[in-house]
Amino acid sequence: MLTIILLLIASYLLGAIPFGLWIGKIFFKKNLHDYGSGNTGTTNTFRILGVKAGISVFAFDLLKGTLATLLPLFFHINGVSPLIFGLLAVIGHTFSIFDRFKGGKAVATSAGVILGFSPLFLIYLLVVFIIVLWLFSMISLSSVIGAVFALLGILIFPSIGFILTSYDLLFSIIIFVLAIIIILRHRTNLKRIKNHCESLVPFGLNLSKQKEK
């Protein structure tokens, strides 16, 4: 039991590591909270610190979720689903004890959790993400629609035997929680999308015809 408790705490602390914030401060002498959206996640890192830093932060944030999900396998823990460990990493990422309980928008770390538990489901979500990004050139919209399609996937796929061969109650609950976290963390982005002032990326068709900011 003590091992399980320690690993659950470790999962939160692993997720709480604010790679974007630390990389910005150490290598660029910039506090991401003072630039752009003020967020320490992948998108703001790309915009403020550049491609290399953005890719690094994305990879680290993704791995946080995957490693936390795999911790019980590494330590041969039974009786607690790997998804619980992954969820704690996402909570740590979103409400980091190392950053005054601030954090990212949970997209990359949630993707890491799904990668560690159901890689095929992540591929499905990645396809959705890329299609939406190509059409509208908005990372935020792609993330939110990806979260919605995750909810649709856990409802529909088990009934048709596609990707998810059977209903998994805990997986469904975790996906629901992750999707809600992602959507709520993008509230301000959704308002900007509604007002046609959301930031765009130089990729895709931009069917909204909004000017890049």
UniProtKB/Swiss-Prot annotation:
It is found in: Cell membrane. Catalyzes the transfer of an acyl group from acyl-phosphate (acyl-PO(4)) to glycerol-3-phosphate (G3P) to form lysophosphatidic acid (LPA). This enzyme utilizes acyl-phosphate as fatty acyl donor, but not acyl-CoA or acyl-ACP. It comes from the Bacteria. Its EC number is 2.3.1.275. This is Glycerol-3-phosphate acyltransferase. Pathway: Lipid metabolism; phospholipid metabolism. GO terms for biological process: phospholipid biosynthetic process.
